[in-house]
Amino acid sequence: MSKDRIQLSDHFTTGRLLRFVASPIIMMIFTSVYSVVDGFFISNFAGKTAFSALNLIYPFLQAFGCLGFMVGTGGSALVAMTLGTGDKKQADNLFSMLAASTIVMGIVSTIIGWFLLEPAAQLLGATPELLPNCLMYGRILLVFQTAFMMQFFFQSFFITSEKPKLGLAFTVLAGLTNIVLDFLLVGVLRGGIVGAASATVISQMVGGVGPMFYFFNRKNSSLLHFVRPKFSAKALGKACANGSSELMTNLSASLVSALYNLQLMKLIGADGVAAYGVLMYVGFIFAAVFIGYAQGCAPIISYHYGAENHDELKNLFRKSITMLAIAGVAMFASAQLMATPLAKMFVGYDTGLMELTEHALKLYAFSFLLCGFNIFSSAFFTALNNGAISAAISFLRTLVFQVFAVLVLPMVLDIDGIWYALVFAEAAALLVSAALLAKNRNRYHYA
């Protein structure tokens, strides 16, 4: 066996850990590219009305897609722990059963989402001017919801199967497909929001369907392969419970985004929604680094927890906290320096909107100092198969604290209260995360 191949059972130095998590980090960044690229081309080639419509309906679509993220992250923790006990046959069965369950969830989501799309768009504040674009974009994405969910599912399991580089290759290919098709369909052919939606779903097919062929091939060196699954409601329930924090994070993000949009429509109008859309795109990419790191670490943590290797758990925890602190400072500094060019890139055609976006981004950037610790803390407890604590952190961070901040801070700080809302939520969540990590350190032996 090559000395360069990194296995879950290894001892991880800082360099080895960074090498292992590099692929999932880049995977998450490229996944975030979908909405960012759509937003860039729609804003610059279809105008701010279409751009505002996309940002208004996206939280609704994201709420359905997060089911794949839930089963992927929660299921990968369960499968990695099973591998840690040495039961390869059961790991394959669980992996296959969870994949089939995600496909069924995707089909059901498409049906439900189709009927709820128009009332949801109206509830989210879509005006008669925005509604047609909301419906057109939403219907195209809903038809391919299963591929979207499977893409999230496979991101976690490529890491667990010790094939993060292959997962990265699929994600990069899907991301490049989206970029090229957006350029052709929106930039060259002026296909507007229909072209952007078409580019997105084709790229999701690449990332969500392509990996199936790999895992059906039992001759490759993956730790996991598809087999004829035996359904287990208990295992599916455990995977969903493990991934409930990720479900809560994504559902809450969708609900909170909708609340942001409603507040901004009331305080500023469509320009506020457009500015918030830019913040979300920048936030997607920056948070993708932390989410990718947490996803990359999770199977390692689950494996060593299953193997009762407490020394390695302590090693992983210490190194992670240090690297997250360094990354947070670097991202904050980058966001401050890049606020003007980023605002210009998305909305440079409107001077007033560009200035609003630049100001908002500089305030919003303070959240990058803190969010990495909270994302990791939630994922850490998921990896330890403690879905309850993980979900509690996510629920407070992404819903309770943010809803409070979005509703209350504008009363004190006016529009700046909207831009500071996430900073407040991350600071409050950090206190909760630190307390829970301290309380459970002897139970799980990571510190």
What are these model-derived regions, one by one?
Residues 1-21, 79-144, 188-244, 301-367, ...:
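Short alpha-helical transmembrane segments in multi-pass integral membrane proteins
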Residues 9-46, 59-74, 78, 103-110, ...:
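N-terminal transmembrane alpha-helices
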Residues 24, 28, 40, 77, ...:
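Transmembrane alpha-helix boundary and packing residues in multipass membrane permease domains
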Residues 33-52, 121-128, 184-191, 251-285, ...:
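Helix-terminus/linker motif at the lipid-water interface of multi-pass membrane proteins
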Residues 51-111, 148-167, 275-333, 337-339, ...:
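Small-residue-rich hydrophobic transmembrane alpha-helices
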Residues 63-66, 110, 178-183, 208-212, ...:
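Hydrophobic transmembrane alpha-helices of multi-pass small-molecule transporters
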Residues 140-159, 170-178, 196-211, 291-294, ...:
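Short runs within selected transmembrane alpha-helices of multi-pass transporters and secretion channels
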